[in-house]
């Protein structure tokens, strides 16, 4: 007997899912931009990030069947949690982190992939110019190269160091030329500023609700994947397990330094979108369909909450 496809299953494999989602999201961004102000640069970064997520999905076969849920989930999560005042800094960090992920997994099991490693970590170096605290991820990412991409070697390690440094090599020349080297010193000084640990005084209720929504989807996606990972190829399992690890690390960093919520939330969205997309694509049954519809409704309500209600400080 053929199983009747639920609403969730139809959406998951539809070729119209991404075009429809992108059109609706773009209309929302344009409407918000006309009312709120100039957010067109942020919109361009959001669309570019979505295209990179499409490429990440295609290059690594994140879904073992045709599905555009990775990019749909990413674009929806990014828009719902960032509007009406998206952060340009966070969008730059998000774009660079996706580019890093795409490049580093292109060197899977290749301990001679010095070029890919260099460019991957150069993306991380560019991101650190906007958000220097992302350099705290370096030990985690080297561990990821050891245990997940299986591409760690002394040559690749040296390439990663050079990749992180190279953006600052060019920036330092500019700052010396403009006699503004103090800005670069202050930039690195903020890297070791621990006076703001556990400072939740700048966090709003909106930010807490957004983080709770992303965390909920991350937990749902992670639990589902760990339960069904046997059906995926080893490389795919490694990718998803690295996403779970980075989600956990990002959440812990966010607890430690909540003032960086926008940038860390962007990294969490990159890691959470494939996990939840896997849940949407490969779960069946009435309960899962109800869960999917409930989360869609929650996303709409969260968007309306962020757009219509002014932020209120948590403390």
Stretches found by the model and what they are:
Residues 23-30, 185-208, 221-225:
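Juxtamembrane membrane-water interface segments that cap and precede transmembrane helices
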Residues 34-35, 73-91:
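Aromatic- and kink-enriched transmembrane "portal" helix at the membrane-lumen/periplasm boundary
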Residues 59-77:
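Transmembrane-helix signature of polytopic, membrane-embedded enzymes
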Residues 100-115:
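Membrane-interface transmembrane helices that cradle and orient dolichyl/undecaprenyl
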Residues 117-130:
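Membrane-interface alpha helices of multi-pass inner-membrane proteins
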Residues 137-162:
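Perimembrane helix-loop-helix junctions
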Residues 222-246:
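Membrane-interface helix-loop-helix junctions at transmembrane boundaries of multi-pass membrane enzymes
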Residues 261-278:
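Hydrophobic/aromatic-rich transmembrane helices and adjacent perimembrane loops
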């Amino acid at each position: 007997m053929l199983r009747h496809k639920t609403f969730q299953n139809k959406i998951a494999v539809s070729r119209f899912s991404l075009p429809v989602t992108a059109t609706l999201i773009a209309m929302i961004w344009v409407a918000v931009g006309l009312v709120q102000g100039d957010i067109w640069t942020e919109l361009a970064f959001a669309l570019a990030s979505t295209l990179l997520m499409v490429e990440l999905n295609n290059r690594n076969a994140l879904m073992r069947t045709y599905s555009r849920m990775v990019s749909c989930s990413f674009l929806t999560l990014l828009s719902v949690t960032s509007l009406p005042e998206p952060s340009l800094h966070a969008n730059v960090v998000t774009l660079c982190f996706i580019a890093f992920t795409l490049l580093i997994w292109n060197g899977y099991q290749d301990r001679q992939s010095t070029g890919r490693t260099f460019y991957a970590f150069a993306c991380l170096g560019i991101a650190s110019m906007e958000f220097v605290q992302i350099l705290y991820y370096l030990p985690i990412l080297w561990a990821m190269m050891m245990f997940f991409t299986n591409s760690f070697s002394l040559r690749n390690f040296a390439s990663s160091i050079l990749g992180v440094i190279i953006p600052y090599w060019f920036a330092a020349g500019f700052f010396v030329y403009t006699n503004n080297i103090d800005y670069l010193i202050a930039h690195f000084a903020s890297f070791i500023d621990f006076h703001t640990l556990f400072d939740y005084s700048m966090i709003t209720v909106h930010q807490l609700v957004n983080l709770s929504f992303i965390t909920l989807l991350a937990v749902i996606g992670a639990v589902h994947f760990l339960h069904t990972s046997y059906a995926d190829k080893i490389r795919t399992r490694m990718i998803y397990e690295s996403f779970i690890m980075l989600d956990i690390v990002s959440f812990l960093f966010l607890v430690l330094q909540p003032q960086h919520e926008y940038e860390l939330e962007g990294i969490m969205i990159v890691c959470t979108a494939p996990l939840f997309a896997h849940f949407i694509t490969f779960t069946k049954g009435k309960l899962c369909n109800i869960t999917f519809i409930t989360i869609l409704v929650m996303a709409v309500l969260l968007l309306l909450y962020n757009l219509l209600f002014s932020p209120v400080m948590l403390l």
